[in-house]
Amino acid sequence: MEAVSPIRRFTVDGVNVYYEHYQNPGRQTLVCVHGFLSSAFSFRKVIPLLRDKYDIIALDLPPFGQSEKSRTFIYTYQNLAKLVIGILEHLQVKQAVLVGHSMGGQISLSAALQKPELFSKVVLLCSSGYLKRSHPTIIFGTHIPYFHLYIKRWLSKEGVMKNLLNVVHDKSLIDEEMIDGYGRPFQDEQIFKAMTRFIRHREGDLEPEQLKKMNKPALLIWGEEDRIVPMEIGKRLHADLPNSVLYSLGQTGHLVPEERPELISEHIADFIK
């Protein structure tokens, strides 16, 4: 019997969203939400470890990955959270557990605050936190024609390898599959124009007062060597989220789904029980 492809697409609020659905009827649904400059690809090591136990959905947040690089969508965290909710409503999911990495953690928290009845628990993997909105000068700059070329130049200068070296602790983990998986979406020229809008529209992270209203059970997992979102941010989020627990992983950087998939999968399974 031929295996059913998990690849799906659905249009929510006028933007076409790519997602993967590893169906396991009757089981708890997990929704994997990736971080900035990433995609569902970042969960590729975690999903095989959990797919026998759970119904898993992993999406590409626009404009990243294989989702549409819309030039009309308003790229706020609130709107991206609505896309997550829209996919779940389309699939008639009654209740889910959010698993958000980095920026995806903020979007997961926004989704849980927007529609609390849809989500039972939240898992935050090195979640971003307490970031302010972009400086007004940068926001103004996004209105300048060809600003997208500055973004392209910046990303080209940094390069996929340099970015990966910055987000993992053990450099030996970086291989050709990883470089290709994280770099391929940026071969589409349209992403740079969409990212201009993303920079323009992105609001700041949730304020402490908003976080304190989040009474869902929350599991926080952090890499002790995270140079992107340091451990101190995890401790602050743990203090502000009233029903949270924090685990730290030694010898681990920011890209925890790639670096510690087995350990993360075990923590998630224990948390959901």
Curated annotation (Swiss-Prot):
Molecular functions per Gene Ontology: carboxylic ester hydrolase activity
Keyword annotations of the record: Hydrolase, Serine esterase
Active site: 102, 254
E.C. designation(s): 3.1.-.-
Domain of life: Bacteria
Entries under Gene3D superfamilies matching the protein: alpha/beta hydrolase
Enzyme class: hydrolase
Occurrences of domain AB hydrolase-1 (ranges): 29-131
InterPro entries, per database record: AB_hydrolase_1, AB_hydrolase_fold, Epox_hydrolase-like
Protein family: Belongs to the DmpD/TodF/XylF esterase family.
Record protein name field: Uncharacterized hydrolase YugF
The species this protein was found in: Bacillus subtilis (strain 168)
Gene label: yugF
